[in-house]
From Swiss-Prot:
GO terms for molecular function: GTP binding; metal ion binding. Belongs to the TRAFAC class TrmE-Era-EngA-EngB-Septin-like GTPase superfamily. EngB GTPase family. PROSITE patterns: G_ENGB. The keyword Metal-binding applies. Transmembrane segments: none annotated. It comes from the Bacteria. This is Probable GTP-binding protein EngB. Necessary for normal cell division and for the maintenance of normal septation. GTP binds at residues 30-37, 57-61, 75-78, 142-145, 173-175. The lineage of its organism: Bacteria, Pseudomonadati, Thermodesulfobacteriota, Desulfuromonadia, Geobacterales. GO terms for biological process: division septum assembly. Keywords: Cell cycle, Cell division, GTP-binding, Magnesium, Metal-binding, Nucleotide-binding, Septation. GO terms for cellular component: cytosol. PANTHER family: ENGB-TYPE G DOMAIN-CONTAINING PROTEIN, MSS1/TRME-RELATED GTP-BINDING PROTEIN. It comes from Citrifermentans bemidjiense (strain ATCC BAA-1014 / DSM 16622 / JCM 12645 / Bem) (Geobacter bemidjiensis).
Amino acid sequence: MIVKQTEFIKSATKPAHYPEGNLPEIAFAGRSNVGKSSLVNVLVNRKNLVRTSSTPGRTQLINFFQVNDDFMLVDLPGYGYAKVPLAVKKEWRPMMETYLSKRRNLRGVVLILDIRRTPTEEDLQMLAWLRAFSVPPIVVITKCDKVSKNERARQSAVIMEKMQLKKEELNYFSALSKEGKDAVWARIDALLSPAAAETTEISGDPAPSAPVND
């Protein structure tokens, strides 16, 4: 996809605040400090469309950005940051669960993992959540420039085993070298296609234990 324009539309915490209209949505999710902001900024050719907070866990809203006239890019709160107050964490779960389980515009979620880190329980729970709601995941492994080829292979094996993923489901990315940018866009474009829209349905199944978001 050639990105000509990207603009912030609004923030939301509940369905009444979501943007109106029928534009399809691709959401981005991952732990705090996993490189989500850098990934989004590289994809849309912007330096600071999505800003990295100086304090992990500060992002508490679902943020909607319109890309061209084609789709909404949705920035979800990061999860897994231990210092966020418990009361705030409890507010985030229903917000996230409602969006992922009920939002009809949602076509898929880019689930972001750090190549240097073993997937956490929150990562496993997020993937289980997406599967339970029949939301297609795009798994993107970030910060690949920070490890050797051998370490990438070792960590990939760990990720595939823990998350029950196949090799072809992993998409490697580096914000520094732009490795993987085209591949990630290809995955997104596939989910935005009319054929994908006909097969993507939001399930009403009960949610598994969900990650607490930061």
